[in-house]
C-alpha cells in the first residue's frame, strides 16, 4: 500500500516545522499545543470506552454555570484539560464553559504568556446517543505583564487577534482541526501509534453548499427575516433546487461537515425564552474560534445582524451571541435577509 507523504507527518513535526519558519519563535506555543493535544487524547480514550465503563455515561444530576445539566463526561473532560493546561508552564489563565470564573495557574507552577478559552466537551447532551461531540478552543497572547497571574482582560480579546483556534472531533475517528492564522489543517489520530497525523492539509471550505444546519423546531420563535431566509433556501419556485437540512445538534459535528462539504450553520436568537435574548452560543470559546477557522478556510462568520464575529470584543467570560457561519456565498445570501440590529 502506498503512503502519501503528508500521512507520515505528525502534529508534533508539523508544529516544529511551522516554528522553524518564524525566527522569533520560542517554542512556547508548540509546547502548549503538545499539552492540549495530550489532554485531547485522554478524553478521546474515555469517549471511546463510554458505553463500556461505569460512571461515564449519563448526567451528574448537577447544573453547570450555564444552567445546563452537566454530563459525567463533561466533568471528566473539564478536569483533564484544566489540570493539563494550567500546569503546562505556558498558560497564564484559562476560561472554561464549566466554570463561572476564570481558572488560574496553581501556586508553584510557571506562568506563561498564552490564554486559552475552551469548551471541554461541546454537544455533550448527545453523548448517551453515541453522536459525535467535540472540544473547541481559542488561544490568545496575554496583554498583561509577563510572569504575573493572568487576568480576565487577557481573555476578553477580539477574535481577530487569536493566535490559534481549533477543535477536536470525537467521531468515527478522532480528528483535530487547527488554525494558526495561516490556513487550516486537519490531523487524524492514529490509534496504532497514538499520534495525530496530517490527513487534511490546507483545508478549504467550498464557496457554495447545498446544506443548511439549524434547529427548525424553533421556527415559530424566529424573526420574520430568518423565517423568510429559510423559506427561500427551501423553495422550488422557478425550478430552484432546495437546500437539504442537516442538523446534528453538535456545533463541532455540524461545522465540520459544512467545512468539508460546503453549507451554512445558523443559530439565531428567538423568542422561545427570555433567557438568551442575544443568542445562545458563547462568543469566546464557540463562535470566535469557529469564525477564525471558517475565515481562514475561505468562509464567513457573522451574527444574525450581519456583524463580523471576529470584530466583536467580549465584555464578559460567558458572553453569548448569535452565529451564522459557513460557505462564503451562502452567508452572503443570508445577509440579504438579515434583520437590522435593534
Swiss-Prot record:
Pfam families the UniProt entry points to: FBPase, FBPase_C
Residues the entry annotates as binding substrate: 122-125, 215, 247, 280
Binding site for Mg(2+) 2: 119, 122, 286
Subcellular location: Cytoplasm
GO molecular function per UniProt: fructose 1,6-bisphosphate 1-phosphatase activity; magnesium ion binding
Signal recorded as keyword: no
Top-tier EC class: hydrolase
CDD domains in the record: FBPase
Gene Ontology BP, a term: gluconeogenesis
Binding site residues for Mg(2+) 1: 97, 119, 121
Pathway where it operates: Carbohydrate biosynthesis; gluconeogenesis
Lineage: superkingdom: Bacteria
Keywords: Carbohydrate metabolism, Cytoplasm, Hydrolase, Magnesium, Metal-binding
Cofactor note: Binds 2 magnesium ions per subunit.
Cofactors named for this entry: Mg(2+)
EC numbers, comma separated: 3.1.3.11
GO cellular component: cytosol
Catalytic activity: beta-D-fructose 1,6-bisphosphate + H2O = beta-D-fructose 6-phosphate + phosphate
NCBIfam families to which the protein is assigned, alphabetical: PRK09293.1-1
Family of the protein in this entry: Belongs to the FBPase class 1 family.
HAMAP family membership: FBPase_class1 (MF_01855)
Assembly with partners or alone: Homotetramer.
Protein name as it appears in the record: Fructose-1,6-bisphosphatase class 1
The organism of origin for this protein: Leptospira borgpetersenii serovar Hardjo-bovis (strain JB197)
Gene behind this protein: fbp
Amino acid at each position: 500500500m502506498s503512503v502519501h507523504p503528508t500521512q507520515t507527518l505528525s502534529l508534533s513535526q508539523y508544529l516544529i516545522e511551522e516554528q522553524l519558519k518564524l525566527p522569533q519563535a520560542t517554542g512556547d506555543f508548540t509546547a502548549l499545543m503538545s499539552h492540549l493535544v495530550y489532554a485531547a487524547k485522554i478524553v478521546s480514550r474515555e469517549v471511546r470506552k463510554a458505553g463500556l465503563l461505569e460512571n461515564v455515561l449519563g448526567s451528574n444530576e448537577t447544573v453547570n454555570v450555564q444552567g445546563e445539566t452537566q454530563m459525567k463526561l463533561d466533568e471528566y473532560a473539564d478536569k483533564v484539560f484544566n489540570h493539563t493546561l494550567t500546569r503546562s508552564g505556558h498558560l497564564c489563565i484559562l476560561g472554561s464553559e464549566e466554570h463561572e470564573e476564570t481558572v488560574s495557574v496553581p501556586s508553584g507552577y510557571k506562568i506563561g504568556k498564552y490564554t486559552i478559552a475552551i469548551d471541554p466537551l461541546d454537544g455533550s447532551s448527545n453523548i448517551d446517543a453515541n453522536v459525535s461531540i467535540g472540544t473547541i478552543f481559542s488561544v490568545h497572547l496575554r496583554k498583561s505583564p509577563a510572569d504575573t497571574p493572568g487576568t480576565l482582560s487577557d481573555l476578553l480579546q477580539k477574535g481577530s487577534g487569536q493566535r490559534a483556534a481549533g477543535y477536536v472531533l470525537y467521531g468515527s475517528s478522532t480528528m483535530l482541526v487547527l488554525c494558526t492564522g495561516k490556513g487550516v489543517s486537519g490531523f487524524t489520530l492514529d490509534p496504532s501509534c497514538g499520534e495525530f497525523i496530517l490527513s487534511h492539509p490546507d483545508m478549504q471550505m467550498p464557496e457554495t453548499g447545498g446544506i443548511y444546519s439549524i434547529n427548525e423546531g424553533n421556527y415559530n420563535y424566529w424573526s420574520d427575516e430568518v423565517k423568510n431566509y429559510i423559506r427561500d433556501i427551501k423553495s422550488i419556485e422557478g425550478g430552484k433546487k432546495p437546500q437539504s437540512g442537516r442538523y446534528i445538534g453538535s456545533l463541532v459535528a455540524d461545522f465540520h461537515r459544512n467545512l468539508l462539504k460546503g453549507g451554512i450553520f445558523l443559530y439565531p436568537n428567538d423568542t422561545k425564552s427570555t433567557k438568551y435574548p442575544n443568542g445562545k452560543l458563547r462568543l469566546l470559546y464557540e463562535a470566535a474560534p469557529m469564525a477564525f477557522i471558517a475565515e481562514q478556510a475561505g468562509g464567513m462568520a457573522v451574527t444574525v445582524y450581519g456583524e463580523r464575529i471576529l470584530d466583536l470584543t467580549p465584555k464578559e467570560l460567558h458572553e453569548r451571541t448569535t452565529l451564522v457561519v459557513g460557505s462564503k456565498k451562502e452567508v452572503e445570501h443570508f445577509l440579504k435577509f438579515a434583520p437590522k440590529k435593534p
